[in-house]
């Protein structure tokens, strides 16, 4: 079986690409949460599902009643884990490569955080796409951040919205979505 398509999906505050403060996201964007769920669960092939890969700290930050994330295979990475299928919905693995050897019937793989996983895997050749929700705020310096993406975006090409629409499928994509003081847009990037 061929390896599935691997994409990073993340919401980040421009211009510094901040993604968190004290282990939490410093915003609650209702439509962005819906987009995340729709994109990470949507499949086009029958009898397949998608996988979400996250670090152990991200897994632990999800309230227990919401774990595992439904309708997706949840892969939790930690250097201290042995590669092990826990049940039909959860896999523990020590690396992205070893986790992909344990999966079958997976259409797409989405890396969902946290920062250490994002910043390590951005340079992994398995990652072919970035789905970045670019968030703007009138005074971004007023939003407390202690966690940032270290993405070499000069090695990536931002795709037109039509390519994003093809990639995400049925999901309706608005422009300049406003929630509170935040404005955001969904973007797709591919390697140069």
Curated annotation (Swiss-Prot):
Molecular function in Gene Ontology: dihydrofolate reductase activity; NADP binding
Pathway assignment: Cofactor biosynthesis; tetrahydrofolate biosynthesis; 5,6,7,8-tetrahydrofolate from 7,8-dihydrofolate: step 1/1
Annotated residues for binding of NADP(+): 11, 18-24, 56-58, 78-80, 113-120
UniProtKB keywords: NADP, One-carbon metabolism, Oxidoreductase
Binding-site positions, substrate: 32-37, 72, 112, 118
Catalysed conversion reaction: (6S)-5,6,7,8-tetrahydrofolate + NADP(+) = 7,8-dihydrofolate + NADPH + H(+)
The protein's name in its UniProt record: Dihydrofolate reductase
Originating organism: Candida albicans
